[in-house]
A protein has these predicted regions:
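Non-catalytic, conformational "gating/processing" segments within enzyme and secreted inhibitor domains
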Residues: 44, 89-245, 263-355
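Detector for small/aliphatic-rich hydrophobic stretches
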Residues: 1-139, 150, 386
Length: 389
């Protein structure tokens, strides 16, 4: 009998999420992803942010910090071993088997005021393994804006082409960037889809897509339903929704959404239904510009970097403190696959199917849900929620 998940809630054996919850609470990349998902869900609309892009910007700042400022930043990144592990995920070798248009590019840059805060001689080498660039510029000149914009466009696949204006008193600015594109293993179809997305405020313009796949994994607990949908490179999209009547806000804020996403990504307690999965999910393009992430970083425990007396002596001798942290992000999901880009700025002033198949498990994401996109190595590239608008 065909299982339809999404039209109504189905009870399922409860699966303990303790180990996943512990993993996501440990300082580091996954903890940052969990906090970003919760922080963004305080908005009323759909949103998308990039944990990976933010992490690289923090890592760049950390490599320039000293003393108590360094200790505080390291406590958020999880220490030396966790930092190495995170960078290994983010800069993992490109898989050999990919779609022709596959791309995952992550990079960072630091732009210092050539007049007031010349760079330490070897800082460029310090961030070389992060695909990093370090340069001294005149922030009052049009040339500086052009250089930063060119770098940003190159490293976001042309999705973001204009770097923000920097004040003349800027000591240095960090810009990290990410671009990702991949194709589904099992493409989805956007024609003759009769499923209607049930947003809090009904909308008729939410285009759905659906299709059958044999390679996805299904997580079904009393709290959540989650589905992973793989891409050609080994990257995967994970969609998660409440299975107990909880609102999307409660589902996300309780941590249940991220726990379900991680468990599904890690294949802990998941199944691959013998009949495959018939997935229905909206196709969408989300974009956010200039999202302020400073408050979220403070909630993680980063305080000294924002205060006078912050020590970034491995970057420059000049006194400096972080004044703002902003991120721009875009993510498009369509029947062919996923494409996304992001930038983060720290501004610092002074298998084969069997012949006889059971029917697939039908999973319909027809009401608000949380989602994440992971790279082939497991790095969380994007997290967000979709409400239909």
């Amino acid at each position: 009998m065909k299982g339809d998940m999404g039209q109504e809630n189905k009870q399922a054996p409860d699966i303990s999420l303790d180990s996943v919850a512990s993993y996501s609470c440990e300082p580091g990349l996954m903890s940052i992803a969990a906090h970003l998902l919760k922080d963004g869900c305080t908005d009323m609309g759909s949103f998308v942010v990039s944990p990976a892009c933010l992490y690289i910007a923090i890592e760049t700042l950390t490599r320039g910090a000293k003393g108590e400022t360094l200790n505080e930043l390291e406590s958020v990144l999880g220490g030396a071993e966790a930092r190495r592990d995170a960078c290994s995920l983010l800069f993992a070798k490109c898989p050999e088997q990919t779609a022709s248009d596959y791309r995952l590019a992550i990079a960072t840059s630091l732009w210092a005021n050539k007049f007031t805060s010349p760079l330490r001689r070897n800082f460029g080498r310090t961030i070389a393994d992060l695909h990093g660039k370090a340069a001294e510029v005149d922030f009052e000149s049009s040339e500086a804006k052009a250089l930063m914009s060119s770098w940003l466009s190159k490293n976001t696949g042309g999705k973001f082409t204009s770097a923000p204006e920097m004040d003349a008193d800027t000591v240095f600015a960090i810009i990290s960037a990410l671009y990702f594109k991949d194709s589904w293993v099992d493409p989805l179809d956007d024609e003759d889809i009769e499923v209607v997305f049930r947003a809090p405020e009904p909308r008729s313009d939410v285009a759905m897509m659906g299709g059958f796949g044999s390679y996805g994994h299904l997580l079904s607990t009393r709290e959540a339903i989650a589905v992973s949908w793989p891409m050609q490179s080994g990257a995967v999209a994970v969609f998660a929704m409440s299975n107990n009547g909880a609102t999307l806000d409660d589902f996300v804020q309780s941590g249940a959404a991220w726990d379900a996403i991680l468990r599904c990504r890690m294949r802990m307690g998941t199944t691959r239904p013998k009949g495959g999965i018939e997935l229905f999910v909206p196709q969408f393009e989300l974009r956010s510009d200039d999202r302020d992430l400073g408050g979220m970083l403070r909630s993680l425990g980063i305080e000294k970097a924002f205060l006078p007396g912050a020590d970034f002596g491995n970057i420059t001798e000049a006194d400096a403190m972080v004044s703002k942290v902003i991120q721009g992000t875009m993510l498009k999901l369509d029947p062919n696959g996923a494409e996304g880009a992001a930038y983060t700025i720290f501004a610092v002033p002074a298998g084969c199917a069997p012949e006889s198949m059971p029917e697939p498990v039908r999973v319909v994401f027809d009401h608000p849900f949380a989602f994440a996109i992971f790279s082939h190595s497991g790095a969380p590239l994007f997290v967000g929620v979709y409400r239909g608008a």
